[in-house]
């Protein structure tokens, strides 16, 4: 597919996404609200995106105002939806849950529109991250040339429906994304960045080429069978733990935006018990079990690329 077809399809899918999000807003707004609870987190200011987070103060909102904030949040996809002082590199987060009473027919209608919305989100992400063929550092320019001010992470995030949950409780998760990669994978990625011939701020084009060339040399010097890992820290994330009494099952969901709980009237489903998201303080985090990690040596800091050392 040529570049212009790809851009046209991206713009078309995004227009469809805006329509389905509006339809979802209308559908949910017409349903009887039985409870709503959302947790506002501090905005991340420009220039502070990479600072370690040690404390987060949470503000709780309930009822109709929480529902209004939650429904608005699903449609906050652009930078102009937030203040000028807020970082464009940090996604907006509004954990919480909106609980609606539904008939069986209403549930099916809502599930259909949520499914369609999530399919469009997944397709947009695939177009931008895979089909464009661009390395990550060039995607920003590609997206903002055609969808100016789009916050991609907010756009990609899926909407999570819950059916007749018994309780929804909230907490915080600290973790790393760990991925095994091959020497060839990394060299291919670096060659693609080198051949693109563009500057990536704050570097000039020549400085960027020099940096990538040094990284390629470092990787090429490794033995072919070297075990490599990308170990990237993820900033502390709000999560929801959902309990289903009938199935005796707990499901944990990432919760960057409100979950949508549907309580079926015909089934006599009761209002789920709702927990609170408490303030985060890194000093009070307790690890239930922390296994010994294999020793690693940092090779390419920019990519969080490590060499696994033999014990």
Curated annotation (Swiss-Prot):
Cell compartment(s), UniProt: Cytoplasm
Biological processes annotated in GO: DNA replication termination
Gene Ontology CC terms: cytoplasm
Coiled coil (UniProt feature): none
Keywords: Cytoplasm, DNA replication, DNA-binding
Cross-referenced InterPro entries: DNA_replication_term_site-bd, Tus_dom1, Tus_sf
Highest taxon, organism lineage: Bacteria
Molecular functions (GO terms): DNA binding
Gene3D superfamilies for this protein: 3.30.54.10, Replication terminator Tus, domain 1 superfamily/Replication terminator Tus (3.50.14.10)
Transmembrane segments annotated in the record for this chain: none
Family as reported in the entry's similarity comment: Belongs to the Tus family.
Role of this protein: Trans-acting protein required for termination of DNA replication. Binds to DNA replication terminator sequences (terA to terF) to prevent the passage of replication forks. The termination efficiency will be affected by the affinity of this protein for the terminator sequence.
Protein name: DNA replication terminus site-binding protein
Gene name linked to the record: tus
